[in-house]
């Protein structure tokens, strides 16, 4: 249950980061977009890792 809750929290965080990215996509703000894209990728990677750990406990 704890891993599932953590995975859901990471998904919500990723959604929030995506929400920050969306309005900036048409801008020239690579100084902001680049770290946001990196954060999005890292959160997605963390989600997958937690998901694998959760499956391993079954």
Predicted regions and their residues:
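N-terminal acidic leader/helix
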Residues: 1-22
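Short, charge-rich amphipathic interface segments used for partner binding and complex assembly
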Residues: 19-57
């Amino acid at each position: 249950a704890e891993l599932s809750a953590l995975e859901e929290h990471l998904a919500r965080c990723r959604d929030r980061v995506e929400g920050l990215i969306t309005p900036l996509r048409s801008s020239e703000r690579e100084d902001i977009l680049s770290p946001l894209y990196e954060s999005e990728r890292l959160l997605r990677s963390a989600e997958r890792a937690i998901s694998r750990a959760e499956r391993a406990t079954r």
